[in-house]
Amino acid sequence: MLEELRDIMARLRDPETGCPWDVEQDFRTIAPYTIEEAYEVADAIERDDMAALRDELGDLQLQVVFHARMAEEAGAFDLKDVLDSISAKMIRRHPHVFGDGASPGWEEIKAAERAGASEDGSALAGVASALPALLRAEKLQKRAARTGFDWPDPDGARDKVAEEIDEVRTAATDADRFEEMGDLLFAVVNWSRKLGIDPEAALRAANLKFEKRFRAMEDIAGEAFKGLSLEDKEALWVRVKRS
């Protein structure tokens, strides 16, 4: 089946007989679609929609095949190389399953892979700059924590959040407020991490809760909703929240 999808992509990318849109794409133009498809997979999982998950996984697989095809055209690698590479990586990272159970642990193996792939010896090496900011903040903090640079308990992280709130409040310029708001968001992610809470999952849940309540307000008020005063909307919000 994967071979069929690979052949379809080859035909779509054919300069003479393929699809003009597919032919003109490159890695950079396709990358946003790859990210979008990954989020749509996560959304289907969040909604527990198996039919949608099936379709979205297919769309995500298409992105892999698309990138692999472009790489093959450039003479860099092909789809088989991609599959061989991930298979070898999974075997290497699971010596307790595929080899000597006394082999190094997961983190040691990953650290060795990073060291072999880059001259950057930092503990933060390999944290992709293109990750969503919330996720990247958490990954950077986790990496730093492994070196011992971390709050000993959640209280220190909580106090840092309070400190950053004050700094946002007292910032003198827009540029200062921008910087301090970034520090505040970073601190909130850190506090969440210290409490054992996935900040991305927590924010997704908060988004869904807000959306559900706001839609309920719209349903109750109908077409009159937009014309309600802020006071009436706040009263409606409290009503929905209590229901």
Give the residues covered by each predicted segment.
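Flexible "arm" and connector segments at domain edges
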Residues: 1-57, 62-181, 185-243
